[in-house]
């Protein structure tokens, strides 16, 4: 009898764990391949060039989030409150609204490439680099929207297959453009753009194939847009603060020091990006949809669901802390034999960066209940506090401790962000 109860109790986690493992293995494979390519590019790019590439790539990640004005985030929050037919209509409306907003903005940016270059890249990028980065920013919405649908539906295998396919395209294009044709930074940007264009094209094919009833209509589009903007608006500053918390320190480092330090720090943060792809991304594709579905089903009281969620969080953070510490020691031993000498010092900052990501992982658990209850303004406030703290500490600590000051500031800010989310989740029950 006890065995039957135990099996019934834990069987609900089987599909979630399976989806997590599929996404995690796929992400590990993806990041493993791209990491090898990145290490090889270190022998081609100087730290200053690597720093410039890092700045451009961060812009390519950040600008699309502003470009969609919170539409994709609004879609995520609405998805679990609608049935299948309403979800399809929601996708159609969001695509139409996005096109009406994004096309004029992209056109304006293309006409002011030089100004954008001086603001974002301190005038060190070229016009073609900015042009391709803007095209990437426009296309990314469609690829991410499709991947979001797959994550919400917990279709981990298809999601992982697409990721691996995109990674292989990136690798092939990097080999052709960077290592063979030797066109430098712009080759990496083109390779990244080709990979998301592949996902966007497959998403469009699936969109047409799945009887989505695609159409262009203005029927009630204004009222729908208003509702979605109100729902998604807090995500716009929220995205800005999230970016400041995770990546804004690179701009402060570039402003206070030089591109060489940015390149060293960017290489250290690749360990954090690996953690993001192998742990955080699979969580967003498996555990978070699982939790949101569990809240929506209302089969158990919220306090009981949160009690188990909190238990999962603490155990996961402890285990990851141990694994990160062991992995860092291993990296310190083998890193000097793999990396070019000019990049070896980047290994000194890896442990601090990864510990910050572990606390950030904790917020994934805490914020589930806040996301389900659509408490976007609460999340915005917590993000604003943590991001502001990060910037202030960066300006205070970088002049004193250099890159160490940058990593310590980010770690402290992640700890603060975790604490605020944990407190907010307790109040939400």
Task: Tell where the protein language model's regions lie, with residue ranges.
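C-terminal transmembrane helix end/exit motif
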Residues: 2-5, 75, 148-149, 156, ...
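Interhelical loop/hinge segments that connect adjacent transmembrane helices in multipass membrane
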Residues: 2-16, 125, 157, 185-189, ...
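Signature of the first transmembrane helix
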Residues: 15-72, 109-110, 136, 167-171, ...
């Amino acid at each position: 009898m006890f065995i039957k109860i135990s099996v019934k109790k834990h069987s609900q986690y089987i599909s979630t764990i399976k989806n997590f493992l599929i996404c995690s293995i796929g992400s590990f494979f993806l990041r493993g391949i791209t990491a090898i390519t990145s290490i090889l590019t270190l022998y081609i790019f100087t730290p200053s060039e690597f720093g410039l590439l890092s700045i451009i790539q961060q812009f390519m990640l950040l600008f699309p989030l502003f470009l969609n004005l919170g539409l994709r985030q609004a879609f995520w929050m609405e998805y679990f409150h609608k049935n299948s037919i309403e979800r399809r209509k929601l996708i159609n409306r969001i695509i139409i609204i996005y096109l009406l907003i994004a096309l004029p903005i992209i056109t304006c940016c293309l006409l002011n490439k030089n100004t954008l270059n001086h603001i974002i890249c301190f005038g060190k990028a070229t016009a073609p680099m900015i042009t391709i980065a803007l095209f990437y920013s426009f296309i990314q919405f469609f690829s991410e929207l499709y991947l979001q649908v797959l994550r919400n539906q917990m279709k981990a295998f298809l999601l992982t297959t697409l990721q691996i396919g995109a990674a292989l395209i990136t690798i092939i294009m990097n080999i052709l453009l960077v290592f063979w044709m030797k066109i430098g930074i712009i080759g990496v940007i083109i390779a990244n753009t080709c990979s998301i264009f592949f996902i966007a094209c497959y998403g469009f094919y699936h969109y047409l194939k799945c009887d989505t009833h695609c159409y262009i209509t203005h029927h009630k589009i204004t009222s729908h847009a208003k509702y979605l903007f109100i729902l998604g608006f807090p995500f716009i500053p929220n995205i800005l603060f999230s970016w400041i918390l995770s990546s804004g320190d690179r701009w402060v480092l570039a402003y206070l020091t030089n591109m060489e330090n940015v390149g060293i720090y960017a290489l250290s943060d690749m360990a954090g990006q690996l953690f993001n792809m192998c742990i955080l991304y699979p969580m967003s594709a498996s555990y978070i949809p699982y939790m949101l579905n569990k809240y929506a089903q209302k089969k158990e009281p919220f306090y009981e669901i949160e009690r188990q969620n909190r238990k999962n969080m603490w155990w996961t953070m402890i285990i990851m802390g141990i694994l990160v510490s062991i992995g860092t020691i291993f990296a310190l031993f083998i890193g000097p034999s793999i990396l070019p000498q000019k990049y070896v010092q980047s290994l000194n900052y890896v442990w601090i960066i990864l510990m910050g990501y572990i606390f950030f992982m904790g917020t994934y658990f805490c914020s589930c209940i806040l996301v389900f209850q659509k408490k976007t303004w609460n999340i915005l406030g917590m993000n604003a506090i943590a991001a502001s703290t990060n910037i202030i500490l960066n300006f205070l600590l970088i002049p004193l401790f250099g890159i160490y000051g940058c990593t310590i500031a980010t770690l402290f800010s992640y700890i603060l962000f975790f604490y605020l989310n944990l407190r907010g989740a307790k109040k939400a029950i």
